[in-house]
Amino acid sequence: MPVLHNRISNDALKAKMLAESEPRTTISFYKYFHIADPKVTRDALYQLFTALNVFGRVYLAHEGINAQISVPASNVETFRAQLYAFDPALEGLRLNIALDDDGKSFWVLRMKVRDRIVADGIDDPHFDASNVGEYLQAAEVNAMLDDPDALFIDMRNHYEYEVGHFENALEIPADTFREQLPKAVEMMQAHKDKKIVMYCTGGIRCEKASAWMKHNGFNKVWHIEGGIIEYARKARDQGLPVRFIGKNFVFDERMGERISDEIIAHCHQCGAPCDSHTNCKNDGCHLLFIQCPVCAEKYKGCCSEICCEESALPPDEQRRRRAGRENGNKIFNKSRGRLNTTLGIPDPTE
C-alpha cells in the first residue's frame, strides 16, 4: 500500500481550517510501547485520524508514539474510543487537553516514522527506558516546591524556559534534548543526595530524562505526570495554587499557553516585557524570537533591519539572495549556547 499523505497546499488547508465553524480541541499524548512495524501502524492511524478530520503532528517509532493534534469537538469522544481500541497498549492513555486553546493550532495532518519519538542521542544498549522516576501529581508537585531538599530540573529548550518555568527551577542550557541529557547528569553530580524533580511540556521528555538519571546513578528521581499541561489543569481543578510562572511554550501555531499573569521574558529587540514568540517574516530567515507589538510594527514582523529590508525586495531578488545561504541572518541567540535559526515552529522531538 502506498504511503498515505496530504496532497493539498498548506495555504489552501489553512484557509479551509480558518473557515470552519465547529470548534476544535487541541490534544497531546505520548506512549512508550513496542511497535513491531511503525510504517504499517502509521498508515492505519493515518486513515483513522483522517476519517475523524484530525489535524496535527504525529511521530511513530519502534519505541512508541508522540502526538500533538487538533480534533473537531464533536469527534473528541469518538477519537478517544477509537484510539483506545487501536492497540491494547493505548487503552486508557492520558490525553493532555490544551489549557489556552483557540482551536487553530493545526491545519494539516503530518504523520512520520522516525528512529525515536524523541531524539535523545542515547546509544547505550544497557539503558532501560522503562525504569523511570516516580510520578508526581499536582499537590505533590507543590509540596516538592516547598521542600528544601528538592531540585526542579527543566528539561525543555531555552526558548521554552525563557517565557515560563516553575519557581526556582534549574535550566539545562542547550539547543536540543539530546544535548541536555548528558549536561543534566554533569550538572547534578554534586547533588546526588537531593530529590531530583524533572518536568517538560507534556511529560514525554522528562519521563525519558528521569530514566536516564536513574541509569546514571541518581536514586531520588521524580517527574511530573503529564508535564506542565496536566499539572496546571489538575491544580486549577483542585483549587490548588498554580506554581508555574509565565507562559507554557507549545509546538503549534499558538506558540504558548498562558499559565499565570506574570510576564517574565522580554522583547529581544527593545527589552520591553513580552513573552510572545514569532518567526521572522523574512522568508530567508524565519528566526524564532520574542517580539513586542511596538517592534512588530517598527520592523514589520522581522527580527532586524536587515531582514526588514530584504523582505521588502521583489520576490526574485529575495530568492537570489537566499540561494546558497544555508541559514538565516542569525541576529538573536536561540539559546545561550550558540547562534542557531529555526525555520517555522521548532520540532518538539529535538
UniProtKB/Swiss-Prot annotation:
Residues 146-240 form the Rhodanese domain. PROSITE patterns: RHODANESE_3. GO terms for biological process: tRNA modification. It is an enzyme of class 1 (oxidoreductase). It comes from the Bacteria. The keyword Oxidoreductase applies. It holds the Pfam family Rhodanese. Catalyzes oxygen-dependent 5-hydroxyuridine (ho5U) modification at position 34 in tRNAs, the first step in 5-carboxymethoxyuridine (cmo5U) biosynthesis. May be part of an alternate pathway, which is able to bypass cmo5U biogenesis in a subset of tRNAs under aerobic conditions. One of its GO terms (molecular function) is oxidoreductase activity, acting on paired donors, with incorporation or reduction of molecular oxygen. Belongs to the TrhO family. The gene is trhO. Its EC number is 1.14.-.-. The keyword tRNA processing applies. It catalyses: uridine(34) in tRNA + AH2 + O2 = 5-hydroxyuridine(34) in tRNA + A + H2O. This is tRNA uridine(34) hydroxylase. Keywords: Oxidoreductase, tRNA processing. It comes from Escherichia coli O6:H1 (strain CFT073 / ATCC 700928 / UPEC). The active site is at C200 (cysteine persulfide intermediate).
